[in-house]
Every structure is written in C-alpha cells, then in structure tokens.
Amino acid sequence: MVMTDPIADFLTRIRNANQAKHEVLEVPASNIKKGIAEILKREGFVKNVEIIEDDKQGVIRVFLKYGPNGEKVITNLKRVSKPGLRVYKKREDLPKVLNGLGIAILSTSEGLLTDKEARQKNVGGEVIAYVW
C-alpha cells in the first residue's frame, strides 16, 4: 500500500494510541518522523522516544505520557501543511497555538523547530503540525 502522507499517518497513530490510553506506540521510521518525535519529547508531550534500527528502515518507539490521574498530556494534534496544500509562514507570521499553550512544528532551513525556537532563530518555514 502506498502511503501519500506519512506525517499525517504518524500523527494519527499518536492521536489514536493516546485516545486508547496505550503506553507505547511503534511506527516505521523516517528522518522527519524522528525529528517530530524528538520535538514532542523535548517539549514534554511524550515520555521517551527510542529509535530501533533493523535491516529495513527502522522503527520509532514512542512512549506516551499521561498525568497522575490518567489525563492525556496531548489533547490534540493537527496536520497543517499537506501534500496537496503546503502552508509556509514567514518569521513575522509564525502562529501561536492556543496563545502559547501548544506548539507549532515547523520545517525550516535550520531543521525541524518549534514555533518558539523559530522565532528565536529568526526563521520561517513550512508549518507541519500543531500540538496542544
């Protein structure tokens, strides 16, 4: 089966595993998925991320995070820039997700960054997703 949007598939798998209260999620690896997973870890949305190398493309193991009473840390994930409709923002037009409570993940010339990091580095780019 040919997958037209692997990033949307990755975000949907995280959303579904989160809704079902799974502890661990495994997805086929790619560089952009690794970058997104590392940003989610760095920003505190997931517990841990492991990259498992195999003879093929590898696997990313994401350990989801929940609050002390089982409440979800990730409320929602939204794919913004899609293969059929790319969304680019200049550095002065970078979005704030829920007035700074969420993050926007951007693909920039400096690599994958959050909206806050892109503002600090003074770069714009393609808005991959919103997470809150």
From Swiss-Prot:
Pfam families with a match to the protein in the record: Ribosomal_S8
Gene3D superfamilies per UniProt: 3.30.1370.30, 3.30.1490.10
GO cellular component, one term: ribonucleoprotein complex
Molecular function in Gene Ontology: rRNA binding; structural constituent of ribosome
Entry keyword set: Ribonucleoprotein, Ribosomal protein, RNA-binding, rRNA-binding
Any GO BP: translation
InterPro entries: Ribosomal_uS8, Ribosomal_uS8_CS, Ribosomal_uS8_sf
Superkingdom: Bacteria
Subunit structure and binding partners: Part of the 30S ribosomal subunit. Contacts proteins S5 and S12.
Function field: One of the primary rRNA binding proteins, it binds directly to 16S rRNA central domain where it helps coordinate assembly of the platform of the 30S subunit.
Family, similarity comment: Belongs to the universal ribosomal protein uS8 family.
UniProt-listed HAMAP family: Ribosomal_uS8_B (MF_01302_B)
Family matches, as NCBIfam families: PRK00136.1 (NF001109)
Name under which the protein is recorded: Small ribosomal subunit protein uS8
Native organism: Streptococcus pneumoniae serotype 4 (strain ATCC BAA-334 / TIGR4)
